[in-house]
Amino acid sequence: ALSTGDYNKAIEETTASIKDNPNNADAYSVRGFATALNGDTTKGIADTKKAYDLDPNNVANYYNMAMVYKLQGQLPESKRWFEKVLEKDPSNTWSVYGIATIYADQGDDTKALDWLEKAIKIDPSVKSVAAEQDHFERFHNNARFKTLVGL
């Protein structure tokens, strides 16, 4: 349900899973991300932190925590969690891309493009995402950006 954008259904399904098994770290993680995407980042943080308490080695939850912090506007904390993903999974495309978007949002153009280039080297499909997302809108006249994404 989460991958199709049906956040309410994802929240319902994971809440049912948690009722069946209160120690289901994956369910807390997914519910936290879905809840944050649905607009309640405070509850989203609480659920992803609970998932971390239950399973501190769940790398997928690190990513979800990074995204929830990003949605909350806590960019340094978000970057820290993307970096934790990369410690365990150095070629995690969307964590590399996530760091690129944070640098873009913070106005550090050189680092944003360096990280974007790394993400594209891992997975060229990143080009089309970067070309369309708001994070990089102001880069559309930047020669290096145009070369990287093929604009």
Where would I find each of the regions flagged by the language model?
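Register position in tetratricopeptide repeats
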Residues: S3-T4, L37-N38, L71-Q72, D105, ...
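Canonical positions in the second alpha-helix
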Residues: A16-S17, K50-A51, K84-V85, K118-A119
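Canonical tetratricopeptide repeat
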Residues: V30, N64, G98, E132-Q133
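Terminal, low-structured helical/coil segments at or just beyond the last alpha-helical repeat
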Residues: K121-L151
